[in-house]
Amino acid sequence: MIIDFHTHFYPDELAPKAMKVMSEASGHTLYGDGTYASLVRFMDEDGVSLAVNLPVATKPEQVVSINRRMVEWNQKQSRVHCFATYHPDFPSVGDMEEELAFLAKHGIRGIKIHPEYQSFYPDDARLVSFYEACA
């Protein structure tokens, strides 16, 4: 069994813009059109059985909506397991703990943070309570 542990897909309506932004920000050529269907097509072509989708919230106000979509995707298909996202500027410790409880309840197995796209260092003090809550 082959598992691709680092993939990205976006809702169909957001995929074109997301792919453009990600390509420009990373300086890399991206493959496919950024949709779930495109990801599964590449998986089938390459003999990949399972994949993990790693969403990134570039703004704190995106965290909850992205995470709800990831839970929905996990409930309606089984080829790609979606992780959640978190942002260092998420509103409060209480909100963060509530969000983590929601994610655990719905079977989310990991959370993606991205220092480069979210403008922080891994040892940033804003993340201490997040790391502790995840432990």
Model-identified regions with their sequence ranges:
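Active-site gating/metal-coordination segments in enzymes
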Residues: 50, 58-135
